[in-house]
A protein has these predicted regions:
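Cationic, low-complexity basic patches in intrinsically disordered or flexible, solvent-exposed regions
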Residues: 9-10
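Conserved, well-structured core segments that form or line functional sites
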Residues: 14-221
Length: 221
């Protein structure tokens, strides 16, 4: 039995946080899953599956690493300096995708959390699928065909891009917490241990493995 609780709805059960989409154990994470404290959502995303569908082809990977960005007071959060055209999506309802570009070439996928008008999100940093470990937010987006067209996408609809619970959760003892990466500009906030990873999965430096056919489907559609 899962012990997750909603701050807003303390009696909400895990089954009420997810929407059943098939007779099996695959369930799309619903708005209620995301509408909780960001650090809780971040930890609970580990072991869930990122699912991408393009032209009838579906690819799914187990989430291995995430980072939490919590509100306007968090100096590492993009919304720290206020509401702008770029950060407007962070103020939207929980369960929306925030996709942005770094270095002019790498996309990063975040899921918006907590509540309307409160800017918070979780960055998806690594997944593991049939090709192996895909480590790094840019590599994840490249392998799964995620780009700026999916910014503001509703992740709870089960269309194009969504997150699933497939019934397996890593034990708390296997979840490590570490400082976030690439946020040295955030001062003392850079040291917050808000990066979470399934510790049993070792880090690897590798390119996202995409077969020629999969590359054609996911990157050229």
């Amino acid at each position: 039995m899962c012990r997750l609780t909603l701050a807003q709805q303390p009696d909400t059960t895990f089954d009420q946080m997810i929407t059943k989409i098939a007779a099996g154990s695959h369930r799309i994470l619903s708005v209620s899953f995301y509408a909780r404290r960001t650090l809780t959502v971040a930890r609970d995303l580990l072991g869930k599956h990122l699912v991408r569908e393009i032209s009838g082809t579906t690819r799914a990977g187990r989430i291995i690493e995430v980072e939490a960005y919590v509100g306007p007071h968090d100096r590492a959060c993009h919304a720290h300096k206020g509401r702008t055209k770029r950060t407007e999506v962070l103020f939207r309802s929980p369960g929306v995708a925030y996709v942005y570009l770094i270095y002019g070439m790498y996309h990063c996928l975040n899921v918006v959390t907590e509540r309307l008008d409160y800017p918070a999100a979780v960055l998806i940093r690594a997944v593991e699928d049939e090709t192996g470990l895909i480590d790094g937010p840019g590599r994840v987006c490249r392998a799964y065909g995620i780009d700026l067209t999916l910014n503001y996408h509703d992740l709870t609809t089960g269309q194009k891009l969504w997150l699933e619970d497939r019934g397996k959760r890593p034990p708390r003892s296997q979840i490590g917490s570490f400082p976030r990466i690439g946020v040295d500009y955030a001062g003392e906030w850079a040291a917050r241990p808000w990066r979470f990873r399934i510790a049993s999965v070792r880090r690897k430096t590798r390119k996202a493995q995409v077969t020629p056919e999969r590359k054609r489907i996911f990157l050229e559609s």
